[in-house]
Amino acid sequence: MSHLKQLRTRIKSVKSTQKITKAMQLVSASKMAKIKSQIAKSNFYIEAISKMMSDIVSIDMYELSIEEQKFFNTIPNKATLLIVMTSQRGLCGTFNYSIIKQVKYDIKELENKGEQIKLIIIGKKGYEALKMQYASYIDSYFELPKIHAENLILQVKQKIMSLVANLEVSNCVIYFNKFKNAMTQIMTRQQVLPVEKYHDDSKIENDHYEYEGKNLISNLINLYVSSQINYALLQSRASEEGARMTAMENATNNANDLISKLVLKLNRSRQAIITTELIEIIAGSEAV
């Protein structure tokens, strides 16, 4: 009988866990849908800013100041800044693994070339994975807020602008998971600075810009860096929720399979006990 009690307790426990994983799956699905909507709304703005910045360099429309040139040219013997975007929480499958693996590989490559490295890590999981081995490279660590990320974007942007302006870094690369669908996230390594040029003049021949104002280019640089961080953050968050939704769906299905096996085991155990009792009763009656 104690064995039956253990099985019932186990079934109850698994059912309780299944309710939690199902709830987490639904929450992640809801969050993912909201973030996908934000991505759709922001894509045009982000692409427009990126193209405008590239066009400035490609067609040489504006004579850049010394300070502005730092954001458009690679400066020799300066550190490479790696911005690593991971999740704050776990239970999202292999979401963080591919990012960490690529970052470690790139760090090794940069070390072999004798280049300096600085890290900005966004998200607790990335920090925990890299802090022991690369503590000397970490310049800044930012936790991901639960809801609004405006302050985070501002802080990261200010840090990047400061490092470039002070000639501490030249190249700036951001690592994040790009959202494809709930089951697929693409590990992405994207250059932020220096701003890349268009090589196909046909793409820009019909675009005509007139740049006026003392601080226009500086303001565009600020908008561009912010937009790149925002883009990566939205993609990463959508990917995280998609990965978590898929992981929780798998956990829910696994729990359902385990419950079925435990119920079958319980029924067989009960049947065995009943059969044993019947045999004892029959044997007793025959003895009488």
Swiss-Prot record:
In the bilayer, the protein is annotated as: Peripheral membrane protein
Keyword Phosphoprotein on this protein?
no
Q: State where it is primarily located.
A: membrane
Gene3D superfamilies the record matches = 3.40.1380.10, ATP synthase, gamma subunit, helix hairpin domain
SUPFAM superfamilies per UniProt = ATP synthase (F1-ATPase), gamma subunit
- Molecular function terms in GO for this entry? ATP binding; proton-transporting ATP synthase activity, rotational mechanism
Cited function: Produces ATP from ADP in the presence of a proton gradient across the membrane. The gamma chain is believed to be important in regulating ATPase activity and the flow of protons through the CF(0) complex.
Question: Under which name does UniProt file this protein?
Answer: ATP synthase gamma chain
Source organism per UniProt: Rickettsia akari (strain Hartford)
Instruction: Identify the gene encoding this protein.
Output: atpG
